[in-house]
């Protein structure tokens, strides 16, 4: 287990260095397979429950099997696996971009409910993934625009926010737990789709980069600069109301 944790730490460090390099140069990688591999590795890292869900469960005291039964993804929080596989490449990237906006808002709401290191690492992972999503969308559409090599700005999520907050702190904890479980499931599916791009290249006309360039696929908006999250000690407010301790 210690070796696996060390491996994840090294992978995270490598991905962070790649992100910093891209932002520093202001350019995206023009190599499709290299960029695709980075996206696959980032998705693999973000799907790991030990990066976010497990620290949340530990800190909130949700260890028991009975409570785990109620820590479930709510239908509609994230696009389904079937829906993701049906999307064209550009639509898939746009869906990832939109969903990352929801995840960033949720991370902001959970800032006081997660260990500081886990929260900062998760935020960095989402930003880096969003940066490479933009780079891939730019590569597929054949754009020469070098700007906006930045992570995604939080935008509209895939589903509306709940109209009313949960009736108790305990229910809010379970709701947040289910959201994080869904987040890891979503990233696992996203990684599978991205691996499918490499495995099926040359066989799928719909997912062909050349075809995407020829048909002038819909443009994914460049990612504007992301807002800085509120510092610890100044809670931004819960996604479903102010957290009650």
From Swiss-Prot:
Residues 207-245 form a propeptide. Its main location: secreted. Residues 1-26 form the signal peptide. Propeptide processing is not important for receptor binding activity but may be important growth-inhibitory activity. Residues 203-218 have a biased composition (Basic residues). One of its GO terms (biological process) is immune response. Residues 153-166 have a biased composition (Pro residues). Disulfide bonds join 28-135, 71-177. It comes from the Eukaryota. GO terms for cellular component: extracellular space. InterPro entries: 4_helix_cytokine-like_core (IPR009079), Leukemia_IF/oncostatin (IPR001581), Leukemia_IF/oncostatin_CS (IPR019827), OSM (IPR039578). Residues 143-171, 197-245 are annotated as: Disordered. It holds the Pfam family LIF_OSM. PROSITE patterns: LIF_OSM (PS00590). It is found in: Secreted. Keywords: Cleavage on pair of basic residues, Cytokine, Disulfide bond, Glycoprotein, Growth regulation, Secreted, Signal. Glycans are attached at residue 97. The keyword NAD does not apply. One of its GO terms (molecular function) is oncostatin-M receptor binding. Growth regulator. Inhibits the proliferation of a number of tumor cell lines. It regulates cytokine production, including IL-6, G-CSF and GM-CSF from endothelial cells. Uses both type I OSM receptor (heterodimers composed of LIFR and IL6ST) and type II OSM receptor (heterodimers composed of OSMR and IL6ST). Involved in the maturation of fetal hepatocytes, thereby promoting liver development and regeneration. Belongs to the LIF/OSM family. This is Oncostatin-M.
